[in-house]
Amino acid sequence: AGNRTEAVQALFLTVALGIYFTILQAWEYYDSPFTIADSVYGSTFFVATGFHGLHVINSTTFLLVCLFRLINFHFSAHHHFGFEAAAWYWDFVDVVVAFSLYMHIWWGS
């Protein structure tokens, strides 16, 4: 069945990294010396990273569903739109974050 084993492994790793990122972000929030109510910086930080975190959670959930579907042979070489849509969403989140970071750095300089 082609590269199914490699696809399962790669998708598992992607989901694991998404979960790891979410845990690190929660830890960062817990350990932060400021709150959302402290200043404009705190508000901006928590809103920007919070929206990104929510999108990562959504993306990870979509990819986790795709992983279960892949393991259960729900995808084929011609029938895999759910996975393709989840992958596009995951990449969209990456592009938005890259643009957002660039804009914050540019505006901050």
UniProtKB/Swiss-Prot annotation:
Catalysed transformations (reactions): 4 Fe(II)-[cytochrome c] + O2 + 8 H(+)(in) = 4 Fe(III)-[cytochrome c] + 2 H2O + 4 H(+)(out)
Pfam families the record matches: COX3 (PF00510)
One BP annotation, GO: mitochondrial electron transport, cytochrome c to oxygen
Leading EC class: translocase
Membrane topology, from the record: Multi-pass membrane protein
TM segment ranges: 7-27, 45-65, 87-107
EC annotation from Swiss-Prot or TrEMBL: 7.1.1.9
Superkingdom as given in the UniProt entry: Eukaryota
Subunit structure comment from the entry: Component of the cytochrome c oxidase (complex IV, CIV), a multisubunit enzyme composed of a catalytic core of 3 subunits and several supernumerary subunits. The complex exists as a monomer or a dimer and forms supercomplexes (SCs) in the inner mitochondrial membrane with ubiquinol-cytochrome c oxidoreductase (cytochrome b-c1 complex, complex III, CIII).
Role, per record: Component of the cytochrome c oxidase, the last enzyme in the mitochondrial electron transport chain which drives oxidative phosphorylation. The respiratory chain contains 3 multisubunit complexes succinate dehydrogenase (complex II, CII), ubiquinol-cytochrome c oxidoreductase (cytochrome b-c1 complex, complex III, CIII) and cytochrome c oxidase (complex IV, CIV), that cooperate to transfer electrons derived from NADH and succinate to molecular oxygen, creating an electrochemical gradient over the inner membrane that drives transmembrane transport and the ATP synthase.
Entry protein name: Cytochrome c oxidase subunit 3
Organism the protein comes from: Arbacia lixula
